[in-house]
Amino acid sequence: MVLGLFDSGLGGLTVLREIARRLPAQPVIYFADTARLPYGSRTPAEICRYVREILHWFEQQGVQRVLMACNTSSALALPVVASEYALKVGGLIAPAARAAARRGRRIGVIATAATVQSHAYTRAIQALTPRAQVWEVACPEFVPLVEGGRLLGEEVRSVARRYLAPLVEQRIDTLVYGCTHYPYLAPVIGDLLPASVRCVDPAVAAVAELAAALPPSRRLETRAACHFFVSGDPVRFAQAAYPWLDYYPQVQAVALPPLPAAQTN
């Protein structure tokens, strides 16, 4: 079985790294929609169209299962498009909500504007723990910082402090990284939070559930190949991905095929 992962850019590599750690024998195709980065400022209709195009392309590549390594797509597109495909399609919201709700009662979520506006995390967490209080904060400057390789320094601390201030004021006990780009900023974010706050990385939660659902052979130590594709500049993506993968990936640019007429509406 080939697993498809996709994100708008580098964020999904946090999911890929977790797969390499937990499921090293799992073959993966990773697609980064870098030509349309970031997704967080897109409309729900745009995001659903992009996701349909990616899933259609994954089908053509022989992918049997897809994990949306993007919270925005998981929040806005997964409930709409998953049933349209024979692929098994999963996302990040539900696993992260389950992880947050296990112990958290005052839960902060930092995410893209589109994810926050969907209130997907609030609904998912409160469906599990109705008494939980959830505060969601949009952090639109985080993705450009990560994609630009700016992960430390006073600029990053200043931006993070501004986003986290209302959550610290609410005395949260749990923080969900509601975008796969945000764990790259964990050293700064963690330094600005009280030591008692537990951070939830959706990549860890989602891959743990994926590992439990796959046959034991996928958990062997043999390393499977990962093939990388982008809609934008492959050289730029490879250079940006190198520090996080510890190797220089071979990346191929692709043009996503047009959707079948029945899916263009």
Curated annotation (Swiss-Prot):
Substrate binds at residues 7-8, 39-40, 71-72, 180-181. Keywords: Cell shape, Cell wall biogenesis/degradation, Isomerase, Peptidoglycan synthesis. The active site is at 70 (proton donor/acceptor), 179 (proton donor/acceptor). It catalyses: L-glutamate = D-glutamate. GO terms for biological process: cell wall organization; peptidoglycan biosynthetic process; regulation of cell shape. InterPro entries: Asp/Glu/hydantoin_racemase, Asp/Glu_race, Asp/Glu_racemase_AS_2, Glu_race. One of its GO terms (molecular function) is glutamate racemase activity. Its EC number is 5.1.1.3. Pathway: Cell wall biogenesis; peptidoglycan biosynthesis. HAMAP family: Glu_racemase. Belongs to the aspartate/glutamate racemases family. NCBIfam families: glut_race. Provides the (R)-glutamate required for cell wall biosynthesis. This is Glutamate racemase. It comes from Gloeobacter violaceus (strain ATCC 29082 / PCC 7421).
